Amino acid sequence: KFDKYEGEVVVSKEKIEEAGKKVDQKTKDDILFAYERIKKFAEHQLKHLNNDFEVELSKGLIAGQRLIPIDTVGCYIPGGRYAHISSAIMGITPAKVAGVKTIIAASPPKDENGANPGIIYAANLCGADVILNLGGIAAIASLTYGCFNNPPVNFLVGAGNQYVAEAKRLLFGKVGIDLFAGPTEIAIIADKKADKEIVAADIVGQAEHGYNSPGWLITTDKSVADYVMKRIPELIKELPDGPRDSAEPAWRDFGEVVLCDT
């Protein structure tokens, strides 16, 4: 209703193939680059976590540890104002490496064709077994209860807006969740050796996430403080309309530059 989407909720194999054709080669290369590195890290992480053992504490009394992957994981991928392709890679890839049997991804429809093609392409590449054209509260509820002939998930991962966060809070206990995520924020500690342009750009990069995203700079160098305070409004003006509409109030209401003696 709210997405004004009337197509199929479950993304078919044909639609997955269509999505792949809509993604340009540069974006595909970037997705593969990120996927391979996240996968490599997850594989090494698993190798160091997977320490199964048994020990006989006393005669006939045996204790041990086994790490067993859960059966089903739901990966929520934000896609409202921005296509969070990285969320698809970071959520699905570790679950696949861990050996989760069924991975269900959900992302809100971008238009009448469903979720963003880049998100669908990345989710499929990383190993999602099912992809849903579904966002927000409806997606979280559907993943939890298994509303589209898919099994209810055991665990939910993935960020979202305040409504997604509240849905996860309400369902916590019925389903496992990763965390209660609030607005994105950034705090940078910098001295005179810092690259002033990168400091300013990093703060703006977080401020554009939402009107309530704080950004702080803590520095001992006045030239860094002065440059960043002058440069951030300039960078915000260069943003497209949507990100600028978020970054301006975020910096105005929640931005701070703290100049310290030591």
Which stretches of residues belong to each language-model region?
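Conserved small-residue-rich beta-alpha loop and adjacent elements
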Residues: 55-121
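Alpha-helical scaffold segments in soluble metabolic enzymes
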Residues: 30-33, 37-40, 72, 90, ...
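NAD(P)-dependent aldehyde/semialdehyde dehydrogenase
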Residues: 217-262
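Conserved NAD(P)+-binding/catalytic subdomain of aldehyde/semialdehyde dehydrogenases
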Residues: 125-214
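Short internal beta-strands
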Residues: 101-110, 215-222, 228
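Generic structural signal for well-ordered, non-membrane alpha-helical segments
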Residues: 16, 20, 24-38, 66, ...
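N-terminal Rossmann-like NAD(P)+-binding subdomain of aldehyde/semialdehyde dehydrogenases
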Residues: 1-71
